[in-house]
Amino acid sequence: MLVLFETSGGFALFKVLDEGKLSNVEDLGTEFYSAESARRMGLHKFLKNNCDDGEILAVADPKLGDIITEKLDIECVHNDAVMELLRGVRSQLTELLSGLDDNDLAPVSLELSHILARYKLKITSDKVETMIILSISLLDDLDKELNTYTTSVCELYGLHFPELANIVQDNILYAKVVKLMGNRINAATLDFSEILADEVEAELKEASMVSTRTEVSDLDLMHIQELCDQVLSIAEDKTLLCDDLKNKMNKIAPNLTALVGELVGARLISHCGSLWNLSKLPWSTIQILGAEKTLYKALKTKQATPKYGLIYHAPLVRQAAPENKGKIARSLAAKSALAIRCDAFGNGQDNTMGVESRLKLEARLRNLEGGDLGACEEEEEVNDKDTKKEADDEEEPKTEECSKKRKKEAELETVEDPAKKSKQEGVTGLLLLMLLISLIYFFSVNQLLW
């Protein structure tokens, strides 16, 4: 029997000198305890040149054995005894093969592993899309947590200095001011130029001197400042997460990001599960994506369906006038459908298509909101200049035209009067006829009753 042994460097054939030992599988491993006992099996050349007719070939992979049997007409066997035999050969391979060292086999194994990795391991966008979905979910959680903490800071510090909420309306700046100031008495001696503008700083210092609210202990101020640290830490994490999300969206869906922004694009991908699923949707579905509950409720109650869903938060839709939001949302959804398919099915695409579509939509928005009005104003100015120059010449024709119009209106009135009269007479006749019928019916019913 011959044994085919596979390595990263090639193939090796071993011949079983004593096939009787294969009958006892448990004692087969004792033949490979030392290199001297394992070396008794000789080394042969490659398979086709050294396998004689009638030889049985032991292989580790049954699929490989089937291929060898089909191609070379060599009988192959695979069982527990063969696996134990190959395990012993593997343990003493460097001693069985002359001139082979572990250092020689390691580079070949590394190269083979790299080749297999190229075929088996493939970096796809699914992993990145999963990170986008998790990032947008984490961003929503950070927003909720940030709102909760900032509300707590405003409520707690408002007992001590309520005027600060009206002076500093930004939550992050509010937390920075509270952390730096502590007690409101310290505001007069502190420098807020790195945080606030000069006017706001002067107003803050003036309000701190006038405020007469309750005092707080140092322990309470310390807890409030620790809460401010949490607010600033969450805000910093949110900024880093937004930057990372923007980079990922520019790599996965650059055209969609150029049209609707990274946040809206990420929410659309998260709503559908992947960019591939989003690319299968028509533009009409993309337009109302995220407003499914409102849509089903409107269809059930037979009311007006929603015009937009998640796409409402896109910059182009937000900056449009209320009467133009529906038109811009419809156009943006159509362009977004093309951009999504370009990102999903294109290889190495940039954001050229998305930028061009955005410029077209911005031009359309300008035309809807003010382009036509400007053209009309120019025409009116030109007409005013012409009328000023030719005022004297046009006075007589205008009076003649006015008199002609009055004559035509008078003629139309005279023509329309008989028609109006005939219509009125017809209506009165119908009313009289209905009155007579009702009277006849009334008298007939009374006679039957009597």
From Swiss-Prot:
Gene Ontology molecular-function annotations: snoRNA binding
The UniProt record lists the keyword Nucleus: yes
Residue ranges of every copy of the Nop domain listed in the record: 252-370
SMART domains named among the record's database cross-references: NOSIC (SM00931)
Keywords: Nucleus, Ribosome biogenesis
Gene3D superfamilies named among the record's database cross-references: 1.10.287.4070, Nop domain
Single GO BP term: ribosome biogenesis
One Pfam family, short name: Nop
Basic and acidic residues compositional bias, start-end: 399-423
Cellular component GO terms, alphabetical: box C/D methylation guide snoRNP complex; nucleolus; small-subunit processome
Disordered, as annotated region: 375-423
Subcellular localization: Nucleus, Nucleolus
InterPro entries in UniProt: Nop56/Nop58 (IPR045056), Nop_C (IPR042239), Nop_dom (IPR002687), Nop_dom_sf (IPR036070), NOSIC (IPR012976)
Domain of life: Eukaryota
Chief site of localization: nucleus
The family this protein is said to belong to: Belongs to the NOP5/NOP56 family.
Described function: Required for 60S ribosomal subunit biogenesis.
UniProt protein name: Putative nucleolar protein 5-3
Taxonomy of the source species: Eukaryota, Viridiplantae, Streptophyta, Embryophyta, Tracheophyta
